[in-house]
């Protein structure tokens, strides 16, 4: 089947609705929607929940942008795209909970298509989800990765290990020599064997995110914590900011294409702190995180 951008867009709009409803049901607060248009073509719906019962900030963004020329960040690793018009659409979300025992989570599913007269369209899907705990619980990590593995299973035995490895490699802070979290799934440039197969996989990832995340939220959201745990959470959020501004391809793509800055930076935590040469005490739960986030097979 030929790529059907309209069908993908409808799925993404529905996915944004569903995820917002599911997060609101857990939190008790509602998302506020901000619709926007992009001068160069396209627009989107940004939805933010702030200072809820469970989530300090949750942002779920839908965007659909198009233009006559592909930006440098996209053509750098796909030189054949130079000179083509493009459409890019996706849902991207980040959830920053109040409670330091509830991990931060991120998910994204997206579709690109680039066309020029007289040539076959170039298209691909990308996306994934990843988890960033501040305090590690093995049962949470196992559940997260088991959910990821199970949704990959119908698409082939090698799919989960391949996209888990890619996720571990992608969400890595080279300047810190550490992982951002415990990973999950990451895929990009997916366009084989055909459109229907790739679209079905992207849908499975989009729908699988809340199955992976919400049981962990329910398990941890009422755990007691104090100033020490909160300070550590804010300190570790700094790594999130560093990754997004220095290494994340999606952030760079959005800023280079004249995307909406407020929506692109919606992934930022509302509060964060840095501390010069911070070293957690040996044997403390905070020190244990360094070991917990190292790459391993969780399932």
UniProtKB/Swiss-Prot annotation:
GO terms for biological process: protoporphyrinogen IX biosynthetic process. The active site is at residue 106. Residues 240-275 are annotated as: Important for dimerization. Belongs to the aerobic coproporphyrinogen-III oxidase family. GO terms for molecular function: coproporphyrinogen oxidase activity; manganese ion binding; protein homodimerization activity. It is found in: Cytoplasm. GO terms for cellular component: cytoplasm. Involved in the heme biosynthesis. Catalyzes the aerobic oxidative decarboxylation of propionate groups of rings A and B of coproporphyrinogen-III to yield the vinyl groups in protoporphyrinogen-IX. The record marks 175 as: Important for dimerization. This is Oxygen-dependent coproporphyrinogen-III oxidase. Keywords: Cytoplasm, Heme biosynthesis, Manganese, Metal-binding, Oxidoreductase, Porphyrin biosynthesis.
